[in-house]
UniProtKB/Swiss-Prot annotation:
Organism: Arabidopsis thaliana
The protein's name in its UniProt record: Putative F-box protein At1g32140
Domain (F-box): residue spans on this chain: 2-49
PANTHER family to which the protein is assigned, alphabetical: F-BOX DOMAIN-CONTAINING PROTEIN, OS09G0372900 PROTEIN-RELATED
Segments of this protein annotated with the region Disordered: 567-591
Lineage, uppermost ranks: Eukaryota, Viridiplantae, Streptophyta, Embryophyta, Tracheophyta
Length: 591
């Protein structure tokens, strides 16, 4: 009797390729040989061609989604949208809340929710997960993408479109983010998720100079780590019309475009696509007038196309019933609606300026294709990081988390010195001195409704070395009206009484002193109405205000240093005499 273990690997692979990928867990648990085989070869390829395999976010959790496209017809009476299935992901990802997900050839990049500074890259086929820490927990208005260079080194792009810069994390060679400047056009708006194709990332963008909505395509090359030029779309439209980007079998890009007033829908597919060049052909054009109640949302929908059947499947939310719905549209304008599931907390939305952006719960720009990409172990990165820390300066830039000292004797800067605490971009801190003997730093932490103040003082301070001790820690929740600005305000401390006095200007321009003690004692003293008290300057798009309060020391110390008004003139005279003397010596030498 022939046993499964007697079969050749090629025959076993041929058999297992006919098993649905949803049964992969059962296959791996059945036989050690099959488990090893599945970690080195991609199975289930035959079944994947007949199924749509994707992912969706519901209630901030990741779910797998599967249904069969094999029997879909192009008439209204066909009912072959077979076996739709949505199941929760039962692994470590289910322990965190997820707001956004981005797909790249078998890998998922997940952005965690609630101001977490963690990203997760997940390979569903191998079951591998890689946690990545960002520089800060700022995700509002940030666009992400996952891609790779010519050597298949995977990288993460973190794109701050309106700020004009971007960050890159190389998953193979570093544990840090590199910052770059070089956006093709200042003021680009790019809040939609992009599409990954051949390792590059592409985005629909909106510019300030052209008031026609998503008016161009922007490509990013992970090999050169640069954006390409703005590429034109195959159609023109205004700001109230809908555009959406998708990927076709990892070979082409597709754009879905729906006009606002006529509800005419067009789908265009690329015939050539590179970060620096693009050409288009029309795939589908449908007059949606009989279905005017159907309006796709460019902030919350996604779609994919089937070139063989010439259909487009759009995933969106039925606004009347708040359900996840798949709309199947053919070349003749037929429409089929499939209710996938009831939406629970369907969208993560954020207000940026005067517009509210919603992030799609659907991650279905193309059908999932398994990947054999393996992540380097975190322990390996930690070992490398420890070696680098002994050879390099501190480069963590999560806010102002270091001190830089200038030595006027050597006329040089010292080393970058770390502060004794970590904080996020929402926290504020400011520097002071104590009787010109020590440094003090005050940090104000913002965590939900809990606000806390800490005061640290130096035990030792030199241009190249420092050490700290905690002087005061106060829960500031009972006095929530107190706010201080790290750019405008100042403070000093009294070591004997163990109090700290903050000087600040409130919203009505009143200079106020806040006296805070170790037992949460608080007293406010109105100093005076600060008329025209602040000197401000505009740098780029931001206005910086300089504090009128100069109280970084506990008291003024008199000085006998005299200001030499003639020092500059005397140096100039000496320099002139020296040049004249040198000139005379040269003339005498010639004679």
């Amino acid at each position: 009797m022939t046993m499964m273990s007697d079969l050749s690997l090629d025959l076993v692979e041929e058999i297992l390729c006919r098993v649905p990928i949803t049964s992969l867990k059962a296959v791996r648990s059945s036989c050690k040989l099959w488990n090893v085989l599945s970690k080195n070869r991609i199975l289930c390829k035959t079944e994947a061609r007949n199924q749509f395999l994707g992912f969706t976010i519901m209630n901030h959790r990741l779910y797998s989604m599967r249904f069969n496209l094999h029997g879909i017809g192009l008439n209204e009476n066909s009912e072959e949208f077979i076996d739709p299935s949505i199941k929760p992901i039962g692994n470590l990802l289910n322990q965190v809340e997820i707001s956004k997900v981005f797909y790249c050839e078998g890998l998922l990049l997940c952005v965690t929710r609630n101001h977490s500074s963690k990203l997760v890259v997940w390979n569903p086929y191998l079951g591998e997960i890689r946690w990545i820490k960002t520089r800060n927990d700022y995700h509002i208005g940030v666009t992400y993408a996952l891609g790779y260079d010519n050597n298949k080194n995977h990288m993460i792009l973190r794109f701050f479109s309106e700020q004009g810069y971007y960050e890159i994390y190389d998953m193979n060679s570093s544990d840090s983010w590199d910052c770059f400047y070089g956006i093709p056009n200042k003021g680009l708006k790019c809040y939609q998720p992009g599409a990954s194709l051949n390792g590059n990332a592409y985005f629909l963008t909106e510019g300030r100079e052209v008031m026609e909505g998503y008016d161009c395509l922007l490509g990013f090359d992970f090999t050169t780590k640069k954006f390409g030029p703005l590429l034109s779309l195959s159609f023109s439209h205004d700001f109230i019309e809908t555009g959406r980007l998708s990927c076709v079998k990892g070979e082409k890009l597709a754009v879905l475009y729906q006009r606002c007033y006529t509800y005419e829908m067009e789908v265009w597919v690329t015939t050539k696509i590179e970060p620096n060049a693009v050409s288009w052909s029309k795939f589908l054009a449908v007059e949606m007038e009989p279905l005017t109640s159907l309006k796709f949302n460019d902030d919350s929908g996604s779609f994919f196309i089937d070139e063989e059947k010439k259909i487009v499947v759009v995933f969106d939310i039925d606004e009347s019933e708040r359900n996840n719905t798949a709309y199947i549209i053919g070349d003749y304008g037929c429409l089929k609606e499939v209710d996938l599931d009831e939406v629970v907390n369907p969208q993560e939305s954020v207000e940026v300026g005067d517009r509210i952006y919603s992030f799609s719960p659907f991650v279905c720009s193309c059908s999932y294709v398994p990947s054999l990409v393996k992540f380097k172990e975190d322990a390996e990165h930690e070992r490398k990081d420890k070696k680098r820390k002994s050879k390099r300066k501190r480069t963590n830039k999560d806010g102002y988390d270091f001190i830089l000292c200038f030595d006027f004797t050597t006329e040089r800067f010292g080393q970058i010195l770390p502060l004794p605490f970590k904080h996020s971009f929402r926290d504020t801190w400011t520097l002071s001195s104590v009787k010109e003997e020590k440094l003090a730093v005050a940090v104000l932490y913002w965590k939900n409704t809990c606000v806390m103040i800490e005061i640290w003082m130096t035990i030792k301070i030199d241009p190249n070395v420092e050490s700290w001790s905690k002087f005061l820690r106060v829960d500031r929740k009972p006095c929530i009206d107190l706010r201080f600005d790290d750019r405008n305000d100042s403070f000093f401390i009294d070591e004997e009484k163990k109090v700290v006095v903050f000087f600040s200007s409130d919203k009505v321009k009143t200079s106020t002193a806040y006296v805070i003690g170790d037992n949460r004692y608080l007293r406010t003293v109105d100093l005076e109405k600060a008329a025209n008290s602040q000197e401000s300057v505009e740098v780029g798009e931001r206005v910086y205000c300089f504090s009128p309060l100069v109280c970084s020391c506990s008291y003024y110390v008199p000085s006998l240093v005299k200001i030499n008004h003639n020092a500059g003139r005397k140096r100039k005279e000496k320099k002139t005499k020296r040049k004249s003397k040198d000139k005379q010596m040269k003339l005498s030498n010639k004679v």
